[in-house]
Each structure stands twice: as C-alpha cells, then as structure tokens.
C-alpha cells in the first residue's frame, strides 16, 4: 500500500478513533503501526501532542478526557504519522468556541491539504479554499475563497 500513512482520517466521534489506554500510547499507536521504531514514534507523539497543546496530558487515561480533549488527541494521532492529506469528518462538531478555534488554528498551522465534511460555517470560512454545497447528494453550489490558507 504505497499511500499507507499518507492520508489521515479524523472521525466525527473521537471515541470511535481512540484506542490507547493513555493519551501518549494512543498517539504513538499510528506511527508504531506504520513500522516506526519506538524512539521515533515516541518523539513524533510528543511533537504532535505539543502541536495540539496537550503534552501535559500524555499520561492521562483517554477515558478521563473531555470531548474536546479527545478530538485534539485524535488529531494529534493523525499529525504524529506525518500525513500529506487530512480527511476530516465534522472536525468542530459539538465543541465549545475555544476548542473550535484551537482546532482551526492547528489545522491552519499544519499547512496540509484537507478534505472536510462539515456543517460549520466558521470551519468552511476559515479553512476552505474551495467549497461544494450538497443537498441530498446533489451539488447545489460551489465557490472558491479569496483568502490563502
């Protein structure tokens, strides 16, 4: 699989994505599963947790995290694998304004290509360079943004 590890998928519900007992073990799982050695995976996990502002929670059990923290840990798990493309399913759904802003800022800073499925106008406005509006599976509108991401 030549594209293995190149595309990161963020699920709408982070509970469907998080599998490690602790935050660090969860974020290390992806790189280890790609065949990275333990030292490289640990370093990548620490870097990714630092990127999302949760390095201080690395030893916390995943089940003790808030919904926003779980979403950030799931995103860190993707970033640790150094993907070139992110597929994001409702990345800001059910988050408070501060966590939504953090997610958007992290995604902007990543400079990665993204395909985003969302109902959040703020997410579209801040992240999309091109948007396609679907209604019952049919394209009803398309637009390109004037800002650079």
Label each region the model flagged.
Residues 92-93:
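Short loop immediately C-terminal to the Walker-B catalytic DE motif
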Residues 118-119:
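H-loop/switch region of ABC-family ATPase nucleotide-binding domains
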């Amino acid at each position: 699989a030549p594209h293995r590890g190149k595309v990161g998928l963020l699920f709408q519900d982070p509970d469907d994505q998080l599998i490690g007992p602790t935050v660090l073990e969860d974020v290390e799982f992806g790189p280890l599963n790609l065949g990275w050695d333990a030292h490289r995976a640990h370093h990548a996990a620490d870097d990714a947790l630092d990127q999302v502002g949760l390095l201080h929670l690395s030893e916390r059990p995943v089940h003790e995290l808030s919904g926003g923290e779980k979403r950030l840990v799931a995103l860190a798990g993707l970033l640790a694998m150094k993907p070139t493309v992110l597929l994001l399913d409702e990345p800001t759904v059910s988050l408070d304004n501060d966590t939504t802003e953090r997610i958007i800022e992290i995604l902007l800073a990543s400079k990665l290509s993204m395909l985003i499925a969302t109902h959040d106008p703020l997410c579209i406005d801040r992240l999309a360079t091109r948007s396609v509006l679907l209604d019952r599976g049919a394209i009803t509108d398309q637009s390109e943004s004037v800002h650079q991401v």
